[in-house]
Structures are given as C-alpha cells and as structure tokens.
C-alpha cells in the first residue's frame, strides 16, 4: 500500500502516477475521502468512549436521587458508543478497500505508456546469423531434453517433462544461480510454495491479476507464481536490523501460474507454462538504499546472462506494464532466433515500501523509531532460459553447444541429437 502521509502531502503526484500507469486518478480522491471519514469516525468514537468513562465515574459517586438520571444518560451514551464503533468499522473497511485500489507510485523517470513503450537501456551482444534455425521445441525433442506430448497427456496443456540432459541443464542453471547469489552475500532459502491469503495479498498478487493464481479453496491456500511471495512474508510483522546493510535472500522454488490472460499466446513450447522452476533474489533494505540495490540486482542478473552467452537487451519497463507493487522494473530480454524477437528472461522490481507496508515489515532508524522497510526482487534463473540457450547455441548438425559455465553441471560440452 502507498504511504498515506505522502498521499496527503502530494496528492497530485499520486494522480500523475495513476495516469502514467493508465489507471484511474479519481481513486486518489476516493482514498482521501475515505481517509477523512475514517479519521472522523475514530475521533467520534474516542470522544464518546471518554464521555462514557466519565459518566460511569459519576454514577459511582452519585447520590440515590441523582443515580436514575445518570444511569439513563449512561445508557444513552452506551448506545451512541455502539453506533460510533459500528460506523468506525464501516469506514475502516471502506478506507482499506480504497487504499488497496491504488498502485505503487512510480519513480521519476519511468517511461509512460504500455508494453511497447519501454526505454532501451542497453544492448549486449549481437545476434549471430543461423541458417534455417530450429525452434527450442524441435531442438529439445530431437535432443531428448523435454517431452511436451507426455506432459500434456499427464497434466494438460502448457505442461511438460524435462528429461535427461534437459533436466541436468535446468538444474545446472539453477545451481549456478544459487552459487552466484551465495557468493554475493545472499542467504539461500527453499520456501513453501503454498501461502496464506494475507501473504499473497500482501505482495500484491490478489488484485487485478488474481485470476492468474491457483487457489486451493478447501484449505484457503495459494500456490505461488514466484518465491518472491513467501520470502516477502518471511519477515512479515517483524522489525528488522538493517544497520549492517540490506538483508538478501535467494529463493529456489517451483512456481505455478494459471496463465488465464494469455489464451493463444506462446502455446508452443516452454516459454509460457503452468509450472516452472526459478531462483529469485529478494532484498529488504532501507528506502533510501532501494534504488542502488535495484541496480545491484540488475548487475547480478546480467552476470548470470553472461554465463549463458546469449545476446540480450536491458529495458526500463513502461509504467502501464508494471505490476501494482512495482515502482520501477528493469527487464533483461534475450534474443530468440526463430521468433526474431527479444523475450523476457529476467525481471527486477523496486517495490519501495509498498509490499512491506502491507506486510508490516519494519526496521529501526538511527533514533530507534520503527520505519517501513523497502523490498526488491529479481530473477536469477528460470526454466524459460532453456529456450534462449538452445536456440542461440544450436549448430548446423542439429547439436547444441553447452555454455562453458554450465558444462561442469551438465557433464558434456555438446548435446547431440538422439
């Protein structure tokens, strides 16, 4: 949730952020009105409770003659307190709903517009010409790396088996990501992939895109689409010690997405699937350190992309393509030869204090006063990377060269057709 103090002092900035996102700026006024009504209801209820307490003391000290009138007045006050408290509950609910409806305030410099309106930050490497390139599905099946047909037979569309060297390639990629993270001071976590509603909602995944999330109704638990979710909840309700710098975690987990809004998109292969594995970087830090930390996460992502030796670009994602929690997001997109396009491999988001405010994650400032922390996240490796590796490293004879950094994990330098 956004900072109320910032909203009250800078309503025009929040309206401008809403417009940049393509969202309704009128929601700002709705929240301001709800905030005013809530504060008024709290004040009224507090005043009446104080009067009720004073009246009770008078009854205790009253003479027999005074008592009936005072009891009648106390009874009337009790009814007023009950009514005021009910109104407070109503206004609190309306305020919470209005507060949750407003997305994070975008950081200055984020480009306006939608998916295609990103700003290009950097191009790394040149796509090398490949005569009659095969796509990752044809390569993967000819090399015995994955089995789409049996995945669909067992689980349905957008499921797959990774087999043989395909499984080793993914495991090697994820292990390399873990090694990179640990070498840079991250603590490795293997988190639960089922979380409570308050954790899923606290990270911002139960808003406009709630239909993308798998929900186990009987248990009221959600399957996570990224380990960002359980790691964001790891310190919920806690006060952190950030005096020695940010807390950095790397989460290795399976991830689950319904892909409800992607009908007809990327139906072939493993680019857009219901289940995949990922190593995610997650950082808690002081708000003033968040932008520098964002650049560091991007640097670690670029280090991983360097290991797989593929051409890629770095983009500053436009405001209209940001998730509700992100104030800024950088994507690294790798070149996919058969699509003649760059496709997202990593994403790193600066969520400022938005998630931590919902999840009550705080730290103590220099005076010892608790303050809301900032959170950031970023992809260090995921299943989709196999697409870029296979297509960019394919050879004329149908084999695929294994990136040098992955050879120790895979156990061979070249994947040969079966």
Swiss-Prot record:
CC terms in the record's Gene Ontology section: cytoplasm
CDD domains (alphabetical): SerRS_core
SUPFAM superfamilies: Class II aaRS and biotin synthetases, tRNA-binding arm
Compartments, as annotated in UniProt: Cytoplasm
Pathway, per record: Aminoacyl-tRNA biosynthesis; selenocysteinyl-tRNA(Sec) biosynthesis; L-seryl-tRNA(Sec) from L-serine and tRNA(Sec): step 1/1
Coiled-coil annotated residue ranges, if any: none
Family annotation (Pfam families): Seryl_tRNA_N, tRNA-synt_2b
Record keywords: Aminoacyl-tRNA synthetase, ATP-binding, Cytoplasm, Ligase, Nucleotide-binding, Protein biosynthesis
Molecular function terms, GO-annotated: ATP binding; serine-tRNA ligase activity
Enzymatic reactions: tRNA(Ser) + L-serine + ATP = L-seryl-tRNA(Ser) + AMP + diphosphate + H(+); tRNA(Sec) + L-serine + ATP = L-seryl-tRNA(Sec) + AMP + diphosphate + H(+)
Domain notes: Consists of two distinct domains, a catalytic core and a N-terminal extension that is involved in tRNA binding.
Assembly and interaction partners: Homodimer. The tRNA molecule binds across the dimer.
Record-linked HAMAP family: Ser_tRNA_synth_type1
Its biological purpose: Catalyzes the attachment of serine to tRNA(Ser). Is also able to aminoacylate tRNA(Sec) with serine, to form the misacylated tRNA L-seryl-tRNA(Sec), which will be further converted into selenocysteinyl-tRNA(Sec).
Name this protein carries in UniProt: Serine--tRNA ligase
Organism per entry: Mycobacteroides abscessus (strain ATCC 19977 / DSM 44196 / CCUG 20993 / CIP 104536 / JCM 13569 / NCTC 13031 / TMC 1543 / L948) (Mycobacterium abscessus)
Name of encoding gene: serS
